């Protein structure tokens, strides 16, 4: 009997499929049942080959730049420096070539990256088997069973083809810009330093540096307004004049005030503040940083764990809406869930559909971030994961509640020709605000919302009534510099490129808006931005993260100043690339047309970099020890490995950052190189998934090898 091969993206996902579908027996790295053989990809098993596949062997050199392979000549190869993944790929090849397999069910993550992982493997194996696409928004067992009973997409579906093309276009864009611009910058400006340029990371670096420099260059200016104090029936209140640029004018007006105001009018209006939409990953990041100072990477990690624990839906979503079907499902369990988790009883849903329930507005691959209704494991969550989970619950309650309604009032007075006003605000219907998270961590660049402060004042004055001025003074208002970015404010700008450009660069915004619609464009994606920002801090060392603020380092500022005027750093060019990638995803332009534009841009970028003169002198990476291979360079930390600093002269020695599912620290590598042996490292995982501990030493081929504790019984 022929069977269907299930391909998951990672082992944890695979185990959930196996449990949900039932009837499986484990056979080494895969599972088998009467209908299925199931395995996982261990994430990315195949990747685009390094630049050495297209250029002469040896060290980097300007002579072969720009390096632009023909579109159809890109080489795919097994994941580099990862023997575990390479060995797994060989086992997976046996399953793909198994004559008993008649169909593949693609069950990698239901997003662009998950599609790319499968397509790379499928083409690398030159596989001809038909396939269907499993599409999941959550890992609860009922949804898994439904998805496998009726796969959402068949091979060749236009949505899948556009998704695949978009993923491939992004991959070759990042490869082409990264390989060319990084080598050009390193050769032209770096001296002995690697200077990394990337489509998204360099745009983020520019945005952070621009804001920091504006903050530091800010020169204080002052404006002025008159404040008068009054009381009625024991209730004190103040009135304020308009703002004046001239202190002398304000002082003259203050001195000329009469002893009493004349009452002019009272204007009342009702204001509605509608509930927020459901959480996307970006909105969750913004709230979590404002409340708990978590970074985007920390929020993503928590959201991913909650998803893998079947507690919430798929985290990498850009949509804040759900379908009516999804809403009805939530109505079935949300009141009991929030009673259990938040101690909120008797929650009731509104009579009409909330604004966040609108399937027609779902433009991406996934609905908004919501709970699944599962409760197993909630009590075991870490504090961070628990906080993120409760934020998702709170947002559901907020989104499914009535509007908050305020009664606003303005009392206006006049004194010697100067207008004075006092404002009142009364929250008459709490609505969704009743369910807002109560925890608040204040940040220096946040102002309290005026509408959330109740000030009820009832004055019985009639027009012309005199109101005694009990006290008067001049208030000096100091101008504020643009606030240095926090994870919240940076995410807000990166996920709304249109608003960012409109506020920060109106001329650029107008120019771009005349070319195309900026709505919906972002810098990078919600799934990639957190890790790119983290790399700028921990790997590139271009940005420091201090006291919840992103501050460029000396190296970051030097690099920014050297390249700030070239096209690859221009946020307008980032917007153009994002728009073109969006067109590919929507099937409006072909990958070929896009690639032709991209290669012209890359060639221009390399030429611009080679015209630069400023050398980068700031220190970048700490040497952890002498390279054991060439004996010349230092082993330093890179994005995915610890490698030789003398790479430009051909030394390719490196130690992969993750061995047996355990990330190695810089201290581990330092001990290995300088002492010949690490301290005892716990948390390695065997191929069967068992935990073990060991020392690391270098074998005769200079590769890390396990040395087990002989004293352990």
Regions inferred by a protein language model and the residue ranges of each:
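Active-site phosphate-binding and catalytic loops of NTP-dependent enzymes
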Residues: 25-29, 155-161, 183-187, 213-218, ...
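Metal- or metallocofactor-binding catalytic centers and their adjacent structured scaffolds
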Residues: 246-279, 285
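Intrinsically disordered, low-complexity regulatory segments
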Residues: 1-171, 175, 481
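Basic, low-complexity terminal or inter-domain segments flanking catalytic cores
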Residues: 2-5, 24, 80, 93-96, ...
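Amphipathic alpha-helical transducer elements in NTP-driven molecular machines
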Residues: 11-18, 35-38, 42, 82-93, ...
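Conserved short loop/turn motifs at secondary-structure junctions
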Residues: 2-5, 107-110, 191-194, 268-276, ...
């Amino acid at each position: 009997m022929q069977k269907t091969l299930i391909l998951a993206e990672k082992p944890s996902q695979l185990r959930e499929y196996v449990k949900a579908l039932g009837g499986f027996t484990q056979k080494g790295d895969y599972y088998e049942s009467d209908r299925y053989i199931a395995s996982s990809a261990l994430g990315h098993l195949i990747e685009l080959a390094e630049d050495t596949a297209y250029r002469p062997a040896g060290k980097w050199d300007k002579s072969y730049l720009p390096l632009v392979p023909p579109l159809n000549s890109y080489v795919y190869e097994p994941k580099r420096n990862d023997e575990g993944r390479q060995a797994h790929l060989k086992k997976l090849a046996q399953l793909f070539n198994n004559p008993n397999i008649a169909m593949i069910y693609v069950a990698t993550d239901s997003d662009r990256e998950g599609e790319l992982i499968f397509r790379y493997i499928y083409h690398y194996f030159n596989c001809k088997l038909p396939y269907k696409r499993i599409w999941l928004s959550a890992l609860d067992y009922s949804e898994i069973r439904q998805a496998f009973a009726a796969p959402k997409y068949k091979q060749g579906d236009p949505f899948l083809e556009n998704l695949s093309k978009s993923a491939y276009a992004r991959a070759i864009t990042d490869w082409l810009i990264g390989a060319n611009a990084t080598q050009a910058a390193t050769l032209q400006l770096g001296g002995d330093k690697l200077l990394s340029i990337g489509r998204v990371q360099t745009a983020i670096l520019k945005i952070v540096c621009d804001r920091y420099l504006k903050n530091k260059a800010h020169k204080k200016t002052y404006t002025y307004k008159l404040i008068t104090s009054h009381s009625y029936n024991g209730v004190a209140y103040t009135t304020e004049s308009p703002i004046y640029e001239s202190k002398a004018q304000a002082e003259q007006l203050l001195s000329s005030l009469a002893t009493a105001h004349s009452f002019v009018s009272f204007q009342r209006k009702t204001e509605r503040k509608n509930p927020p939409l459901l959480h996307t990953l970006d909105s969750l990041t913004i709230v979590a940083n404002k409340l708990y100072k978590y970074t985007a990477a920390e929020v993503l990690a928590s959201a991913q764990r909650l998803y893998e624990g079947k507690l919430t839906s798929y985290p990498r979503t850009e949509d804040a809406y759900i379908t009516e079907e999804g809403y009805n499902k939530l109505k079935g369990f949300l009141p009991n869930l929030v009673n259990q988790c938040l101690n909120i009883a008797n929650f009731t849903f509104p009579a009409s559909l909330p604004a966040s329930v609108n399937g027609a507005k779902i433009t991406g691959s996934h609905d908004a971030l919501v709970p699944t209704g599962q409760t197993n494991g909630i009590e075991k969550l870490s504090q961070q994961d628990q906080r993120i989970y409760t934020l998702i619950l709170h947002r559901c309650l907020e989104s499914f509640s009535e509007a908050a309604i305020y009664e606003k009032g303005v009392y206006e007075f006049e004194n010697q020709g100067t207008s004075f006003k006092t404002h009142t605000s009364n929250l008459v219907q709490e609505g969704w605000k009743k369910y807002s998270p109560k925890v608040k961590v204040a940040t220096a660049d946040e102002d309290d919302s005026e509408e959330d402060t109740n000030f009820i004042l009832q004055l019985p004055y009639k027009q012309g009534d005199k109101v005694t001025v009990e006290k008067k003074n001049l208030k000096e208002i100091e101008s504020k510099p643009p606030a240095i970015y926090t994870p919240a404010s940076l995410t807000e700008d990166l996920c709304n490129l249109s608003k960012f450009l409109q506020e920060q660069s109106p001329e650029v915004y107008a120019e771009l808006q005349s070319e195309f619609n900026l709505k919906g464009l972002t810098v990078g994606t919600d799934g990639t931005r957190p890790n790119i920002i983290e790399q700028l801090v921990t790997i590139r060392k271009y940005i420091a993260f201090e006291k919840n603020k992103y501050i460029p380092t000396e190296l970051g500022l030097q690099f920014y100043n050297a390249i700030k005027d070239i096209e690859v750093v221009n946020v307008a060019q980032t917007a153009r690339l994002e728009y073109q990638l969006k067109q590919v995803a929507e099937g409006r332009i072909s990958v070929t047309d896009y690639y032709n534009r991209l290669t012209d841009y890359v060639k221009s970028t390399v030429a611009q970099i080679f015209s630069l003169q400023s050398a980068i002198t700031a220190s970048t990476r700490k040497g952890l020890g002498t390279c054991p291979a060439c004996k010349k360079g230092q082993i330093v930390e890179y994005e995915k490995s610890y490698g030789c600093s003398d790479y430009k002269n051909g030394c390719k020695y490196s130690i992969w950052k993750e061995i047996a599912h355990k990330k190695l620290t810089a201290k581990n590598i330092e001990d290995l190189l300088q002492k010949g042996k690490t301290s005892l490292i716990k948390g390695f995982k065997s191929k069967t998934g068992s935990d073990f501990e060991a020392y690391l030493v270098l074998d005769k081929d200079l590769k890390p090898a396990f040395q087990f504790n002989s004293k352990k019984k």
